[in-house]
A protein has these predicted regions:
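ATP/Mg2+ or Mg2+-diphosphate-binding catalytic cores
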Residues: 138-171
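Active-site acidic catalytic loop and adjacent metal/ATP-binding pocket
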Residues: 32-79
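Conserved ATP-binding subdomain of kinase catalytic cores across diverse folds
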Residues: 1, 115-118, 122
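Active-site activation/catalytic loop segments of kinase-like enzymes and analogous catalytic loops
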Residues: 78-117, 134-149
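Residue-level preference for long, well-ordered alpha-helices that form the structural scaffold
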Residues: 17-20, 24, 98, 102, ...
Length: 171
């Protein structure tokens, strides 16, 4: 699978079947077109594809590993970073993060990642769009399982990320 194929495939189908009630077709198309414009230039590697705190193992106060590899695949390298960071927003309720607080988390995660391997300029510029695409994926998924509340929550996270785009690119 590739994120781009998913966006154009089952995600589009789910949103179309829902008659674009949660996210507008124009917002979806704008995001897909942007993703498509750089997708083939982004480095690919084996990714976990479900990185969140529930899949982390801790021992003696530190990270000791992670579990749940059933979604692992070869995909864009920045997917796991973006998924983890959007997951922080999704796990919070009642706007627990201000925009500035969340951007500090973004900076910290990217800095930690880059302490091991640097991201390219193209990858850094793609991060907001990949995050927005992940939220569109969740909108489509929650629609497909008839969970309108969580689909709307994902849409709200999508807009939160849109409002942070320039700050994310400057990390």
């Amino acid at each position: 699978n590739s994120m781009l194929e998913e966006m154009k495939g089952w995600i589009n189908e789910s949103l179309t079947n829902n008659e674009w009630r949660i996210i507008g077709k124009e917002e979806y198309l704008k995001t897909v077109e942007l993703l498509e414009s750089f997708y083939n230039y982004l480095p690919k590697q084996l990714i976990h594809r479900d990185i969140h705190f529930g899949n982390f193992l801790f021992s003696k106060g530190g990270l000791s590993g992670y579990i749940d590899f059933d979604l692992s695949q070869r995909n864009i390298r920045i997917f796991d970073i973006c998924y983890f960071l959007t997951g922080l927003l999704a796990e919070e309720t009642d706007n627990a993060f201000t925009q500035n607080e969340w951007i500090e988390n973004v900076k910290s995660v990217i800095s930690g990642y880059e302490s091991v391997i640097n991201l390219s300029i193209k990858e850094k510029n793609a991060i907001p769009c990949v995050m927005e695409s992940i939220e569109i994926l969740f909108i489509a998924y929650f629609i497909s399982v008839k969970d309108t509340k969580r689909a709307i929550d994902a849409y709200n996270v999508f807009h939160f990320i849109q409002n942070c785009e320039s700050d994310i690119k400057n990390t």
